[in-house]
Amino acid sequence: MSGRGKGGKGLGKGGAKR
């Protein structure tokens, strides 16, 4: 929910991925 503009391209969250 916090890493949306970081690595959340098509994941929605991405914060945990990037």
Swiss-Prot record:
- Determine the domain of life of the protein's source: Eukaryota
Keyword DNA-binding in annotation? yes
The residue range of the signal peptide is: none
Gene Ontology MF term list: DNA binding
Give Gene Ontology CC terms. nucleosome; nucleus
Q: According to the UniProt entry, which residues carry N6-acetyllysine? A: K6, K13, K17
| Quaternary state and interactors | The nucleosome is a histone octamer containing two molecules each of H2A, H2B, H3 and H4 assembled in one H3-H4 heterotetramer and two H2A-H2B heterodimers. The octamer wraps approximately 147 bp of DNA.
What name does the UniProt record give this protein? Histone H4
Q: Which organism is it from?
A: Sepia officinalis
